[in-house]
């Protein structure tokens, strides 16, 4: 098991990068219709959510202000689940809220674990990385 531990932080950073970019893509599509081509007017709360997704997604992806951005993103997904999906039932598979739940918990994990060693936060010495706290 110890032989695999050396890969844990690099793969955590890769996961953080991919999740952040995917989240930012959701926001870009919501605001600008980047991928689906939709450009309809959004209610103000959805517009705010789209901007949170773009900003927090890129911050998490590149590991800048990681804990703050991940906490905000996790909270946004909790709000999205309870405002949009939960009225249709509390089971995520039934109410189509699986992605909101997964994002909520992944971002909360990133908030708890921190940026990792492959991040701008680690490069500028902001906060302690998970590798530094486990050694």
Residue ranges and their predicted role:
Residues 1-32, 38, 46-51, 55, ...:
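Extended, low-polarity transmembrane helix blocks
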């Amino acid at each position: 098991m110890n032989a695999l531990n050396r890969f844990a932080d690099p793969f955590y950073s890769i996961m953080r990068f991919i999740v952040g970019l995917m989240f930012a893509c959701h926001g870009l599509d919501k605001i600008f219709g980047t991928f689906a081509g939709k450009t309809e007017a959004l209610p103000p709360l959805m517009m705010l959510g789209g901007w949170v997704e773009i900003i927090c997604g890129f911050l998490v992806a590149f590991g800048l202000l990681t804990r703050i951005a991940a906490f905000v993103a996790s909270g946004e997904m909790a709000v999205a689940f309870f405002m949009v999906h939960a009225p249709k039932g509390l089971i995520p598979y039934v109410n189509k809220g699986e992605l909101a739940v997964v994002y909520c918990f992944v971002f909360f994990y990133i908030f708890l674990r921190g940026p990792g060693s492959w991040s701008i936060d680690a490069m500028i010495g902001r906060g302690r990385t998970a590798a530094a706290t486990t050694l």
